[in-house]
Structure formats: C-alpha cells, structure tokens
Amino acid sequence: AAYGKILPKELLDLPRFGCINVHASLLPKFRGASPIQHAILTGETHSGVTIMKMAEGLDTGDMYSQASLEIAGYNYPELSERLAKLGAELLLKTMDDIESGKAHAEVQDEKKHFTQSGKCEKNSCGCGRRKWPNQLEPDIH
C-alpha cells in the first residue's frame, strides 16, 4: 500500500529502531508511489522489495535488506500479492536482525539506477490503456 506523505523527523525518530518501511522495488530504482506499475510498464524482468529505515525524503532511507524475484508475465494484482508476501517474510527476518544487532543499514547509491515512480493516475500510467513509447500495452490491471 502506498502512503505518499513525508513524515517529519520527530515522528520518524520516536520508535527505538526508527520507522521501518517495506518498499516494493529494489531501491534506489523506482522510488515513489507506484513502483510495481512502473516496473511492469518499463518492461523489467526482475523486481523485488527493500526493507529500509525511513528518512525525511521519499524512499531515501538507508536499506537493511532486499530480495528479488522474476516479474515477467505477471500483471499488477498478481505481482502486488507476490511482492507483499516476499516483503512480509523479509520484514520479519530483518526485524529480528535489527533487534539482535546483526542488521546494518546501507546508504542508497544515488548513481545506481535511481528512478522516481510518481503516482499512477488513470491516464498517466497505462491504467487508462495509454500506450507508452516502444511498449506493447502491458496488462497492469
């Protein structure tokens, strides 16, 4: 589920380990509100989830862990479900590692495939069947 708001630092610092987020992409690729849709629309063959410490920016926090899977041939609902399951499993493991002191957060490499995925509006993201350049109409519904 996308939230799309930037929380103030005072709130992010309240929990003992900070606020932890599950993001449905391999950050820093596809930061933002619609990473799954953008992965489908740009023809990615693999994507995944990132467990990260939240920061004041939009999906800019340090990363604790990532896991990937093949996404070719899946539509949005199917992929969303697969990534949610993968994210839940990785979150449990990562939280155990954070609590035990085994986890180490890694700064996102801004030079490594940084992309921003804005909101997926009905007419801007293929949801309204608009064709993207050099793309067949992917089934993101």
What label would you give each PLM region?
Residues 56-141:
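Active-site-proximal loop/hinge segments within enzyme catalytic domains
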Residues 1-50, 54, 60:
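Alpha-helical oligomerization interface recognition
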